[in-house]
UniProtKB/Swiss-Prot annotation:
GO cellular component: cytosol
Keyword GTP-binding recorded: yes
Pfam families, per database record: MMR_HSR1
Keywords of the record: Cell cycle, Cell division, GTP-binding, Magnesium, Metal-binding, Nucleotide-binding, Septation
Record GO biological process: division septum assembly
Source species of the chain: Desulforamulus reducens (strain ATCC BAA-1160 / DSM 100696 / MI-1) (Desulfotomaculum reducens)
Task performed by this protein: Necessary for normal cell division and for the maintenance of normal septation.
Cofactors (names): Mg(2+)
Residue stretches making up the EngB-type G domain: 22-196
Gene name per UniProt: engB
Gene3D superfamilies: P-loop containing nucleotide triphosphate hydrolases (3.40.50.300)
Protein name per Swiss-Prot or TrEMBL: Probable GTP-binding protein EngB
Entry keyword Protein biosynthesis: no
Binding site residues for Mg(2+): S37, T59
Amino acid sequence: MKIVAAEFVTSAVNPGGYPPGNLPEVAFVGRSNVGKSSLINKVVNRKGLAKTSSTPGRTQLINFFNINNDQFLMVDLPGYGYAKVPTDVRIKWGKMIEGYLKERECLKGVVLLIDSRHTPTAQDKQMYEWLQYYHVPTVVVATKVDKLSNNQWAKQQAVIKKSLPLSKEHQLISFSAETGRGKEKLLKVLDEFIHKDGINLTAIE
């Protein structure tokens, strides 16, 4: 896949604000400050498309981006796990994220971002288990690998795979928004996602 166009569509807090749902969607999810916006910008070759912030917990909306003139939508979900956000807000975000992932019929796959420098958090593990439980096509992307040496990444790769634990059917892609490492691999996965059949979560339940 080659991305030649990317445009912001809308922001939403509930299904009433979502786009119509006539295009395949791929969602990006991860804890606060994991580098989600930077990854999206790198993948679509647009520096300011997804708003980046040095303040964790800043993204409070579900943001939709149209890719390649209606080929599919990228969906940027709010970051989870930021302790300084009030409890009621964290609960609201959790319901917002789960509601989208569970109810969105045009969802084709999820990109779960994990900071390559750290052991997956309890929230990371919970999200991964949830996606597995509902059989949502998933790829795990380890961000900020440019901060690690090759030896450090080799060790962290093993830690991440063991901690989740990573299913054999799921890939772990090392990614750097600085160098572009992992971009082509991720684009290939996105292409595979949007050509899959739909996910019927209601039927699974």
